[in-house]
Amino acid sequence: MSFTLYTNKNTRLQRSELAVPGSNYKMFEKALNSEADYIFLDLEDAVSPNDKSVARENIIKGLKEYDWKGHGKTMSVRINGLDTHYMYKDVIDLVTYSGKYIDTILIPKVGVRDDVYMVDCLLSQLEDEFNLEKKIGIECLIETALGMVNVDKIAQSSQRLEALHFGVADYAASLRARTVVIGGLNPDYPGDQWHHGLSKMVATCRAYGIRAIDGPYGDFNDPDGYINAAKRAAAIGYEGKWAIHPSQIK
């Protein structure tokens, strides 16, 4: 029997996580006044290529101008993928101009542990340059077949790593799985088609002391579907779930 136990690296309340497009500044105030525990301002999927620079500027401005902490929010930013030319500027500009307001960086489409190492190194250099007292945490989206196969190694990749998120939409695409609604169940499959991925990821998170967060449910006009998806995730140990619309926060 092994007596090795990994304690939780960083405890944060993350029951509900509201996704907010960085390109839509007027939504920032709505997020501020929402009931979400966690806010992630998005530079990736929710932002078109032509709006990447504007979204980055909006996020820097919004992090500094709004009293997120006073409203009890934990603040995260989803950067663009490491396979894009936007990523390095995302990290450098965010930390340079608003680093002290950021709690975590969310990395999309993490496939191998070296993806995390790259962002970790950038953060360390920037924190040292600007004498930031608080270290910025890292969260990873597991949303590809490669990421799921390597989830155990990814979970051990950095002392900054606080949470893994199950990115069901891109994960489904990576598997070529047939879906009806993002995060929903396909009636052609006799059971929960996401059970294996969800179970594997939450077990990994619990083993290494990091949080397990379920991703989006795509139809915000289907509250019952969202509630059922949230209950399924909670039943197997997930601590929280994304909301893509304030109406999904309970």
Language-model segment annotations:
Residues 1-250:
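Expand to "…catalyze enediolate/carbanion chemistry for C-C bond making/breaking, isomerization
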